[in-house]
Amino acid sequence: MRRSERLAEQLDWHWREHLRPRLDGLTDEEYFWEPVRDCWSIRPRGTSTAPMSGGSGEWTLDYASPDPVPAPVTTIAWRLAHIIVSCLGYRVGWYFGGPDVDFHTFAYAGTADQALSQLDQTYQTWNAGVRGLSDTDLAKPPAGPVEGADPFPMEGLVLHINKELIHHGAEICLLRDLYRWRD
C-alpha cells in the first residue's frame, strides 16, 4: 500500500466506521440546536448577533476576527460548516481542482440534509485527492494560492486534516449525544 493510500485510509476508516454513521438521521432541529446561550451557528442572513458573519447565500456563518477568548460554543451547523469550508473546502480548491471557497463566498446549508450533502461531496473529493498523491507530492510543501499557506510537507497537511476531522467530528457526535439527553 502506498503512503498516500495509508494516509487516506486512516481517515476513511474513521469516516466509514465512526463519524459518518453517527451523522445519519441528523434533523434540522439538532443541526441548529443551541445548548447554551450565545452560541455561534449558521443563521438566516441578517439575523446574526455575532461580531461578524459571512456567506454568499440566504444563510451566514457567525464568527469574529480575532477569535474571542474563550471561544463561543458552536452548533452542529457551525461545526459542519467549519469542516466543509475551513478544513476541507479551502484545500480541495487549492490542491485537488475543486471550487475556490472561503467564509464569505460559500453558500452555507440551511438544512441538515443540505449540510451532509456538502460534507459528503467535499470529503469524497479530499479523500480521492489524497489517494492520488505520489511520494514526491507528499514530501514537498503543497503549492497553494498564497506562498506559505500550508508551510509543511503535504504529508503533514494530510495528517493535520485527518486530526481536524476526527477532532471536530467527535465534537459533533458529543453535541448529538447531549441533544438526545437534554431536559
Which positions does each model-derived feature cover?
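Short, contiguous alpha-helical
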Residues: R2-T105, A143-D183
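Acidic/histidine-rich alpha-helical segments that form the ligand environment
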Residues: F106-A139, G156-I166
